[in-house]
């Protein structure tokens, strides 16, 4: 008998992992699987995620070796690709047609405001991402698509094709904010194929092909950079017309950097606040004041303006591609992707007054 096709696979370290590959199959975040009703569960203080985060998937896995990543090649002996945790959670695998049907049938109860295709370093990743994109736009045109790209395998023509096929936003996971940190965590130093120059090519192509407000860069705070370095990078992206999607460094179990400390809370809160000011409040990194250690000591705004921004809580929510409701708030709320619910770094929901007080205390050190 031919084997029954698998519609859904939940990571199981004690069973042989089935061979599942894109474009027939995709991995999705645990939050997305809960929102779609594919796995039981509830998320602390948030009912759902507003972005369906999908990963292309292959049994051979990602061929890159980024030091902080749970999907990295160096984990091959320890865990099958489909079983690897990534940004703190499991990524179940589902049949793509089943995912589309569930969303079309309203399994997300209208919660998804965006879908994101995350590419990995694999020879088939580009072509398969085109297939996933085209299928989605044909079936669910009312839910816009973002591409989290893999510049290492791409050329400018690929961006033009993605725009033609209906992608709305194109993002680049630069992650490291200096060439030195990039090289140490993603480049030759760790036997990984990524190159700083190629990533910048992709950001410049995105600015040209997708245009202002339609591209962005992922940046990770806490990998050895100063606050001045990461905020000057935010300003550079903003001046090109892009947005900055900020992630807190959290040591991923099984990664080469699993023993690194998580980002300092005060540093993270100041960077979150300054990034919001740069992206949405008309402030500039070159108008901010930094001390000798590169820490922000003045955000370049009046006290009352700064207090109103902090009180809104918005700077401390997860940053990413926007939803329909508020361009300053990310649809991609990645619940607990960089911290546990007991010590939230990126809030996947609107903050209440108690949350804001906690954040203020953290900022004050």
Language-model segments: which ranges?
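Generic structural signal for hydrophobic
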Residues: 106-107, 136-137, 162, 206, ...
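N-terminal pre-triad scaffold of radical SAM enzymes
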Residues: 31-76, 105, 114-117
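Core AdoMet radical
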Residues: 73-128, 141-158, 162-200, 216, ...
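Conserved strand-turn element in the central/C-terminal portion of the radical SAM core barrel
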Residues: 148, 152, 188-189, 202-228, ...
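Auxiliary Fe-S-binding modules of radical SAM enzymes
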Residues: 7-50, 209, 231-365
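Alpha-helix termination/capping residues and helix-transition junctions
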Residues: 63, 108-109, 164, 209, ...
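Catalytic cores of alpha/beta
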Residues: 155-164, 223-239
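Alpha-helix-loop-beta-strand connector modules within alpha/beta enzyme cores
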Residues: 129-145, 194-213, 264-283
